[in-house]
């Protein structure tokens, strides 16, 4: 049976207020939802004074069960703006099984004109909200909202972070008992920071007792409106006699957070480097972005058009989860760029060009909801594309194309990022607590933190030389549009892809060459790209007058993709390879034992590389992931996915498997 995106099913009363059909309960008080939110959640957690106490560079993390209409989040944001100093940040993490559709959210939030300035920003970025972790960055990075879409007991155990204040705001315990269980409260305790506070609108005795048993000290306090009493409390610590949650494996544990000088060098100004620089700068870091060329996006990130295409698995793999979360994040980032020139959400159609592909697509169509992907038969696909097609396929309505240099330029132009062109680092040395980057014997930059984001070129550094990255040459072809080719309405993919024209040119590609190191475009690969276009649409070939074009004069460009053996990127802190092998040598004899030894981190050295042909999907969110590792923030991905992307995974496999 085709899954349906579990959007909230709502009824609306005569005053325009939403009510859940599933739980037969209201989203907020019939009297004054704003007053109740401010009293129950903001006042009981003492947020006004805690926001005021934050220093520049400080942050407070709020966790919530039940995002609903976002009312609590918006009220917290409004209060934060009123009391927090410039440079302080608010991070809000909320789990929601049944998210409102964008239209319903807009309708619900229209009830609160007092919050319009904040709700307008949320609504602008409330796009591509799909299952799993979905990060939304607001107010130029001052506000971070991480939505965990799905069942709370599936999503919260994957969250890695520390929560300073909890809002318990699911539907009433009698209506939705699954949100008020000992198992869930144990997750709240696991995630609670020392001294974390908690509040909820209910005063039910068994809820209070379960929270107390989880390590919170709860007490009843006078309520508001028709609520006679409510609960508030604080986290005292993991209860005695209960086994504490297992710590992260040392090779995946968080490095000690660096204090003091918040300067970073990012080496490489492609998609990964620019995303990393932007994410760090949003957190108050001063970032020097080193680039060997004269501008950003001059290598693999320099193609005129790249495709926002989700190559998914029906089996919920780490890569598939990363792609869904990364796709959503990239789509939201693109909302700040110019549609039509920098990007376009024209949709992406993946043709079922053979039986194997058709079977794969059938599995995906049964595993994912229609707002993410939908099966179109041949007539429907042809109508959607605007050109003749021989096959149906999967349509991704939120997909499209992106001009990668525009994204890189926007991210590198963020306050706090300084681009240093014509600077090619070839060696790193650690002196005291500073990393030094050299281009030979000349020192070009120093900082306590370095992020290697130069694709496979990072193998030139001794500290990262054994990372198993490989280069794959790819070439794209540019074709001037014709009056007839303007009919192409969406990106169409088979073995290759073709995009609707940008600035009068279609982009098609891309070749895969595993052996060549020469980046000079070749006629043979242009002809190969034209052959892939023929497989996509003979009608489009005719519309583009391909037979009349001189193959020798075709224009395009070639670059190297950078990929890893498991096709996941490498994002996170780097360890000393020799020390790692020595400390964890016992794993080669028994992989089940975990030596009680801290990982030998190369303090301050990180990597963001290996994005392959998925950089538009994975690199922007990987910038957030890297910044979260560095600043000890809640991770923007499930812990298991972050570990699957960790650079240490390869050293670990070599120890365990002997290869």
Swiss-Prot record:
Catalytic activity: 5-aminomethyl-2-thiouridine(34) in tRNA + S-adenosyl-L-methionine = 5-methylaminomethyl-2-thiouridine(34) in tRNA + S-adenosyl-L-homocysteine + H(+)
EC number(s) reported in the record: 2.1.1.61, 1.5.-.-
Source species, domain of life: Bacteria
Localization: Cytoplasm
Pfam family, one: DAO
GO terms under biological process: methylation; tRNA wobble uridine modification
InterPro entries: FAD-dep_OxRdtase, FAD/NAD-bd_sf, MnmC-like_methylTransf, SAM-dependent_MTases_sf, tRNA_MAMT_biosynth_bifunc_MnmC, tRNA_MNMC2, tRNA_S-uridine_synth_MnmC_C
A single Gene Ontology CC term: cytoplasm
Function field: Catalyzes the last two steps in the biosynthesis of 5-methylaminomethyl-2-thiouridine (mnm(5)s(2)U) at the wobble position (U34) in tRNA. Catalyzes the FAD-dependent demodification of cmnm(5)s(2)U34 to nm(5)s(2)U34, followed by the transfer of a methyl group from S-adenosyl-L-methionine to nm(5)s(2)U34, to form mnm(5)s(2)U34.
Family stated for the protein in its record: In the N-terminal section; belongs to the methyltransferase superfamily. tRNA (mnm(5)s(2)U34)-methyltransferase family.
Protein name as catalogued: tRNA 5-methylaminomethyl-2-thiouridine biosynthesis bifunctional protein MnmC
């Amino acid at each position: 049976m085709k899954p349906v995106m579990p959007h909230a099913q709502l009824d609306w009363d005569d005053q325009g207020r939403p009510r859940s059909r599933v739980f037969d309960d209201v989203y907020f008080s019939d009297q004054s939802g704003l007053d109740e939110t401010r009293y129950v959640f903001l006042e009981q957690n003492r947020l006004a004074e805690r926001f005021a106490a934050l220093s520049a560079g400080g942050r407070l993390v709020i966790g919530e069960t039940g995002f609903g209409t976002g009312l609590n989040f918006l009220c917290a944001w409004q209060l934060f703006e009123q009391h927090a100093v410039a440079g302080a940040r608010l991070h809000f993490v909320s789990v929601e099984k049944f998210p409102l559709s964008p239209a319903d959210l807009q309708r619900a939030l229209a009830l609160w004109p007092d919050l319009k300035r904040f709700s307008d920003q949320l609504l602008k970025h409330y796009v591509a909200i799909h299952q799993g972790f979905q990060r939304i960055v607001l107010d130029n990075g001052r506000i971070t909202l991480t939505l965990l879409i799905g069942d709370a007991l599936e999503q919260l155990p994957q969250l890695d972070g520390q929560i300073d204040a909890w809002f318990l705001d699911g539907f009433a315990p009698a209506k939705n008992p699954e949100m008020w269980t000992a198992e869930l409260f144990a997750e709240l305790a696991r995630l609670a920071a020392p001294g974390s506070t908690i509040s909820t609108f209910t005063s039910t005795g068994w809820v209070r007792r379960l929270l107390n048993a989880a390590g919170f000290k709860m007490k009843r306090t006078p309520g508001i409106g028709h609520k006679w009493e409510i609960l508030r409390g604080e986290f005292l610590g993991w209860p005695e006699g209960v086994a504490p949650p297992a710590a992260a494996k040392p090779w995946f544990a968080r490095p000690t957070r660096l204090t003091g000088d918040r300067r970073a060098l990012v080496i490489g100004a492609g998609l990964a480097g620019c995303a990393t620089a932007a994410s760090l700068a949003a957190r108050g870091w001063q970032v020097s972005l080193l680039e060997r060329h004269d501008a950003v996006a001059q290598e693999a990130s320099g193609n005129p058009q790249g495709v926002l295409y989700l190559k998914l698995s029906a089996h919920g793999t780490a890569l598939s989860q990363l792609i869904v979360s990364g796709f959503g994040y990239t789509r939201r980032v693109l909302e700040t760029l110019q549609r039509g020139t920098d990007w376009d959400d024209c949709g992406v159609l993946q043709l079922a060009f053979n039986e194997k592909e058709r079977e794969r697509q059938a599995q995906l169509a049964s595993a994912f909801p229609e707002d993410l992907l939908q099966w179109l038969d041949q007539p429907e696909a042809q109508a959607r594309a605007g050109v003749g097609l021989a096959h149906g396929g999967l349509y991704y309505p939120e997909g499209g194309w992106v001009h990668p240099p525009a994204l890189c330029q926007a991210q590198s132009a963020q306050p706090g990022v300084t681009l240093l062109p014509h600077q090619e680092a070839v060696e790193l040395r650690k002196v005291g607590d500073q990393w030094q980057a050299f281009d030979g014997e000349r020192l070009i930059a120093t900082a306590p933190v370095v992020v290697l984001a130069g694709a496979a070129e990072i193998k030139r550094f001794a500290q990262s030389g054994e990372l198993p990255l490989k280069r794959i040459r790819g070439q794209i072809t540019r074709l001037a549009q014709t009056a007839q080719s303007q009919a192409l309405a969406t990106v169409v993919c088979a073995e290759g892809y073709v995009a609707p024209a940008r600035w009068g040119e279609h982009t098609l590609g891309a070749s895969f060459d595993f052996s060549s190191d020469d980046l000079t475009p070749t006629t043979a690969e242009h002809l190969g790209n034209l052959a892939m276009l023929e497989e996509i649409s003979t009608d489009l070939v005719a519309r583009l007058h391909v037979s009349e074009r001189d193959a020798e004069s075709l224009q395009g460009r070639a670059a190297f993709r950078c990929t890893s053996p498991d096709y996941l990127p490498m994002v996170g802190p780097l360890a000393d390879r020799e020390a790692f092998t020595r400390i964890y040598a016992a794993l080669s004899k028994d992989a089940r034992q975990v030596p009680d030894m801290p990982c030998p981190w190369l303090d301050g050295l990180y990597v963001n590389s290996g994005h392959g042909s998925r950089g538009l999907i994975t690199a922007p969110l990987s910038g957030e992931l890297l910044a979260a590792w560095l600043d000890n923030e809640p991770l923007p991905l499930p812990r298991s996915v972050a570990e699957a992307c960790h650079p240490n995974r390869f050293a670990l496999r070599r120890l365990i498997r002997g290869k």
